Amino acid sequence: MGKNKTKKRTRRPNKGWLAGSSATQTICSSFLLVIAVGTLLLTLPISSRTGRLGVIDAMFTATSATCVTGLIVRDTWSQFSLFGQIIILMLIQVGGLGLVTLTSFFALAARRRMGFRDLRLLGESVSADGLSKATEVLKIVIKLAAAFEAVGIVLLLFAFVPQFGAEGVWVSVFTAISAFCNAGFDLFGRFGDYSSLVPYVNNYYVQAVIMFMIMAGGLGFMVWVELAEYRKKRRLSLHAKVVLQFSVIFWVGGAVLLALLEWSNPRTMGGLSVPGKIMAALFQSVSTRTAGMNTIDLAACSPISKLLMSVLQFIGAAPGSTGGGVKVTTFAVLILTIRSVAQGRDDCVIGGHHIESKTVYRALTIIVIGAVAAFGSAVVVYYNTAETVSVIDCIFESCSAFGTVGLSVGVTGQLNTGAKLLYMACMFMGRVGPVSLAISLTAKPDDNKRKVLPVGHINVG
């Protein structure tokens, strides 16, 4: 009598090139790897004009560049050599588009096979709705980024080449990529350390080009994909509509409030013409959402203006964009959930769509954790700098770090080693934390009763 033999099933290993770790771990470790390499390169004597840069300052700069923040402890133009500036720009580009996005693109270009885990990770990194669409979206993302940056470079050449000569080409390249990636780094320290775009407060052309680049990078690649396909499909997803509507609300609303608050302030907008005041208010509103460039002296702004900008920095840009923060859709879900509750509903409704409860819970969790991180770090920094810095300035700077914005009122330059490490953690969490949190909170769909309204899907965080 023969014995029944059963073959033991063995799980086939995932042969994808990103196999071996979860999506959250891969995203976090990839950013940490880039930061580590960037730190090593920036500590080389060839990277700085003086030939010496401390490890902590190099790590802070690498973290700020990779997390596309823009907070600096050493002025980019006056302290770093051309080699160092190139390293910083490379970190910005990798951090803005994402290491996962770039490596996925090169893997596809080399015709390498991507496993299921790889596709899922790629889909999360570009906020693609569905694995089958991930590779298609990836190609569009790279093309869009290259196109926007090329256009920005060409437009800025007309302003910077006449001003700086041949060096204007490099200034144009650096500024365009930094603006599109919402990084906030600049090469205008030649006009004074940490001057940012203050020397261009009356140059409407430069401001307009940079605003365009900031908006392009901050809307999110999936929104641009839908806008590119709008002529064929004649419709936008709920996600794209929410991103566009609330982005405009925050851009315009922020500009109006800043103009009202700073209109007569002689140290900020008071000395500008009426068109100059309007332009400065609009530029600062757009930049505050995660770009980190300024045309007015932020330290001279009123406390209420700083508080307003802190909120805008905390909100940030759109999911799948080059910007940070808790994301505009996350904040939109919170606001519209509050509205729904005020109307007596027990669910969140946006544009005639019922938003799944797990999306609402995810948004609330991201905002609460983000608030704890931002304001918790503000308390710690204030405790260490209370003699020279106000509490409002600490809140402003901490929201800038968490929102990966890069705007500064002078606090960062006064940080001790411990506070620098805290802000590095804040920048890292602001860049990869919300994304990682959204992934880790993703649950399997349950068997809830069908609602009367159609279900809407929005990427948050």
Give the positions of each predicted feature.
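Membrane-proximal intracellular helices of multi-pass ion channels
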Residues: 1-461
